[in-house]
Amino acid sequence: MEDEEKAVEILGNTEAAHPPSPIRCCWLRLRCLAATSIICGCSCLGVMALVFAIKAEERHKAGRSEEAVRWGARARKLILASFAVWLAVLILGPLLLWLLSYAIAQAE
């Protein structure tokens, strides 16, 4: 009985000494998404997202997880903005051309 109590105490101490670090982002996936946003999205926002993703990965490797999460969040926002801008251009471009042709046809 004493052995079991000691084992439980030792396990409790090791868990308290090394709390599991929360994994909030896959850093490699974030970098790949940033590179994809350069190619498939608005490239200027994608480049900034890639820079922020690399900074987040470096901070994570250095053990500064709070800064890594902050830089990762910025990178994610820029990745989403890059894709949103590109989708808006893809949708609004043809729509505006259609409206322009309609307006010209009505003017004649």
Swiss-Prot record:
Keyword Transmembrane on entry: yes
Cellular compartment(s): Membrane
Recorded topology in the membrane: Multi-pass membrane protein
The UniProt record lists the keyword Nucleus: no
Disulfide feature: none
Swiss-Prot/TrEMBL keywords: Membrane, Transmembrane, Transmembrane helix
GO cellular component: membrane
Lineage: superkingdom: Eukaryota
Transmembrane segments: 34-54, 78-98
Similarity-based family: Belongs to the CD225/Dispanin family.
Protein name as annotated: Transmembrane protein 265
Lineage, opening ranks: Eukaryota, Metazoa, Chordata, Craniata, Vertebrata
Underlying gene: TMEM265
